[in-house]
Each structure stands twice: as C-alpha cells, then as structure tokens.
C-alpha cells in the first residue's frame, strides 16, 4: 500500500477439516495442491502471474478487508468503518466504496498476497437488507465520510 492507494489480496477458504489440521499441526504449508481448499486458484503464488494480473480497479467486487492494506491517513480521511452496520455483511464493501469515492485507488494483488481463511460457522445474516441499503446509499450519493466512524473512538481517548 501507499498513500492514496489501497491494496487487495486474495483469499483461500479452508474447510473445517483443513482448519482443524492447521491449528493442530501449527507447522504446516498450504499450496494449490493442499486438501480442503475452496477458491483453490487463489493459492497460486507466482511472480510472473502477479506481474500479468495485478492491476488497478474501481470495482467493489471481491473486496475483503481480511487481506487488505492501506495508510492510516486514508482511513481517517473517510472516518474508518461505519459503526452503524450491525451483524454480518457489506461493511467491507461500504468502507471500500467510500475510499473509491474519495479518490483513493484500489490495486488488486493477484497471485502474490494470499490469505488463508480459517473455517468458522457463518454468522447470522438477518441484518443484510439494512446493510445492503446502507451500501447502496453510499454508492448512489457518492458518500466519502461516514458520520459514525473512527472519530468517535479517537475523541473518547483524549
């Protein structure tokens, strides 16, 4: 990452069994041939492919803050995550939408920045309609700063 540019890596999902093995062994190696992987192509690590496929994007598709990097000043510029989000869903996309709305550039790091996501039960998605509406509003109105964000916590520390 650099100021004015956030980077997005790829994510490989581990099955419950692969996660249990990884946690039990502690010293293990994962790659495209490992058992129990979803999104297997994301496990490919290649300098050549990285050079060919890493590119700038203005899309929200595939935004996952589990493997995401940016500068603190860029976070503060948009007031961080919107604390009004409840439950699972869309907070990552809404955060990235405000970054893009503010002129911060996205760069996808294909085949180089790989995160292995441990299995866990899925969270309740009952708040998804409200979260979808909040994301749609941010996109439609080109919102840059959320009202209830990180500023609230920074003020409390003073």
Describe each PLM feature range.
Residues 6, 67-69, 115:
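Conserved hydrophobic/aromatic beta-strand scaffold that supports enzyme active sites
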Residues 18-23, 121, 127-130:
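Short aromatic-enriched loop/helix-cap "lid" or pocket-rim segments at secondary-structure transitions
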Residues 35-70:
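A recurrent flexible, glycine/aromatic-enriched loop bordering the glycosyltransferase active site
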Residues 43-44, 48, 140-158:
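Intrinsic low-complexity, glycine/proline- and repeat-rich
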Residues 112-113, 126-150:
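Catalytic core of nucleotide-sugar-dependent glycosyltransferases
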């Amino acid at each position: 990452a650099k100021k004015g540019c956030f980077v997005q890596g790829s994510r490989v999902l581990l099955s419950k069994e692969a996660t249990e093995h990884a946690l039990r062994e502690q010293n293990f190696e994962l790659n495209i041939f490992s058992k129990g992987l979803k999104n297997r192509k994301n496990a490919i690590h290649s300098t050549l492919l990285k050079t060919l496929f890493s590119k700038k994007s203005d899309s929200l598709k595939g935004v996952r803050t589990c493997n995401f990097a940016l500068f603190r000043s860029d976070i503060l510029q948009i007031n961080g995550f919107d604390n009004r989000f409840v439950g699972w869903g869309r907070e990552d996309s809404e955060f990235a939408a405000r970054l893009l709305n503010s002129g911060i550039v996205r760069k996808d790091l294909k085949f180089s920045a790989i995160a292995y996501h441990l299995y866990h039960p899925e969270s309740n998605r009952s708040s998804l309609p409200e979260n979808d509406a909040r994301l749609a509003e941010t996109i439609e109105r080109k919102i840059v700063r959320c009202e209830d964000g990180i500023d609230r916590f920074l003020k409390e520390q003073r």
